[in-house]
Amino acid sequence: MQYTLTRADQEPAPDGASYPLGRRESTSDPMQEQVHRNVFTGKLEDVLNSTVNWGRKHSLWPYNFGLSCCYVEMTTAFTAPHDVARFGSEVIRASPRQADFMVIAGTCFIKMAPVIQQLYDQMLEPKWVISMGSCANSGGMYDIYSVVQGVDKFLPVDVYVPGCPPRPEAFLQGLQLLQDSIQEERRPLSWVVGDQGVYRADMPSQREANRDRRIAVTELRSPDEV
């Protein structure tokens, strides 16, 4: 389990970054190397990882946190017509220490960024972040000094949900993409002090994956049919 400690007198990073973002690099699946080294233990560890990831992705507890109008659409996904309980994410937590993932839903102002960082640091590993809405993704229409131009400037984001605001169905699709990403993760099965060495698969962009289907559409529905 990894804790992020932030000192009050912490010196700024050489590159000007205010948050210790994770370092990413391309690598092969560690399970494949283990299988060639020892077939039995490699397969056993692969099964254990898959089982643990299956339990994690079907019991994601969200943190009750919102910033703007996108939060209204997020809470709508918890109502009966959408039934987010189908995905095991109906248990909303009021404390970040009991939550598994945080949804940044709405406009993130500069004064709010340190608060979001502190709440994120209070979450225990493993933890994930969903950026919901245009304002959280890139600042939206607020290209001004007081709005952070994307929460990925100071937080590691796992899934981006576009829209202004996104519909509840878009949030549910983002939740499913997060589940797919968690299933492919490789994390230590025991307690680890220091770098956890998390392996995450490269997820394809949905914009590129659905490009041919979008181009094939020739007749658009009217607003009252959407």
From Swiss-Prot:
Q: What reactions does this protein catalyze? A: a quinone + NADH + 5 H(+)(in) = a quinol + NAD(+) + 4 H(+)(out)
For region Disordered, the annotated ranges are 1-32, 204-226
User: Where mainly found?
Assistant: membrane
Q: Which GO terms describe its molecular function?
A: 4 iron, 4 sulfur cluster binding; iron ion binding; NADH dehydrogenase (ubiquinone) activity; NADH:ubiquinone reductase (non-electrogenic) activity; quinone binding
Q: How is the cofactor bound?
A: Binds 1 [4Fe-4S] cluster.
What is one term from the GO cellular component aspect held by the record? respiratory chain complex I
- What broad class of enzyme is this? translocase
Q: Which InterPro entries match?
A: NADH_UbQ_OxRdtase-like_20kDa, NADH_UQ_OxRdtase_20Kd_su
The protein's job, in short, is: NDH-1 shuttles electrons from NADH, via FMN and iron-sulfur (Fe-S) centers, to quinones in the respiratory chain. The immediate electron acceptor for the enzyme in this species is believed to be ubiquinone. Couples the redox reaction to proton translocation (for every two electrons transferred, four hydrogen ions are translocated across the cytoplasmic membrane), and thus conserves the redox energy in a proton gradient.
Q: What is this protein called?
A: NADH-quinone oxidoreductase subunit B
Q: What is the lineage of its organism?
A: Bacteria, Pseudomonadati, Pseudomonadota, Gammaproteobacteria, Oceanospirillales
> What gene is it encoded by?
nuoB
